[in-house]
Amino acid sequence: MTRAAKVLFVAIVALAAMALTACFGGSTSEPTRYFTLAVENINMPNAGDASGRLQVRKFTIDQAYQRNNIVYRESAYDFMFYDLDLWASRPEQMVAQVAAEYIVKSGLFASVDTRASGKPDFELLGHIDAIEEVDEGSSQYARLSLKLTLQKPDSDAPLWEKRFDERQSVSSREPRLVAEAISKLLGKYMEEALGAIAGAGK
């Protein structure tokens, strides 16, 4: 092969590589998107005189959801997640933080801590069984399965406990809508939880 032929061959290979890169999106990559949960406007119980110190313990989560990727399912047998659509932080941390914000706004307790700092009067525990997008044919839903427990630190018997598991319809497969729907579900759960806690007299 002559020198001119070698140069031409290298040029053709380079152009082919550039064309393949453009075809497969190598030159322009989609950005990673991050989503979070927000506090909704809910009906708060009549707090009365705030008393006692509550610690919101670190929430736990089912092992399959221990990731920042937003999970979606198309059947009971599927378990998939988005590569570029992520929760801004671990879902159990987000849910615990938002739950703490609801409790602070309720005024039921004199103080609410999310970090251990001495022995509290009460503890709120949470476990997430599922936080996901559910796709069923042409319908989409957001699902949040969450167990909440209020107890005293020295007691194994809960003062109040309930497992919530509901879905809310969303209009499309858009993670932002899923985050909004899960926020609304969490708000609904916390409204019931705060009412029950207030009624139980803590």
Predicted regions and their residues:
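Short secondary-structure boundary motifs at beta->alpha junctions and helix caps
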Residues: 77-86, 154-195
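Generic short beta-strand segments
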Residues: 59, 127-131, 165-167
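Sec-dependent bacterial lipoprotein signal peptides
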Residues: 1-23
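Surface-exposed short loop/turn segments
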Residues: 24-47, 105-157, 171
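Sec-exported extracytoplasmic/periplasmic mature domains
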Residues: 100, 104-108, 190, 194-202
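Structured, soluble extracytoplasmic/luminal domains of envelope-associated proteins
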Residues: 85-107
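A structural "domain/chain start" motif
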Residues: 22-92, 199-202
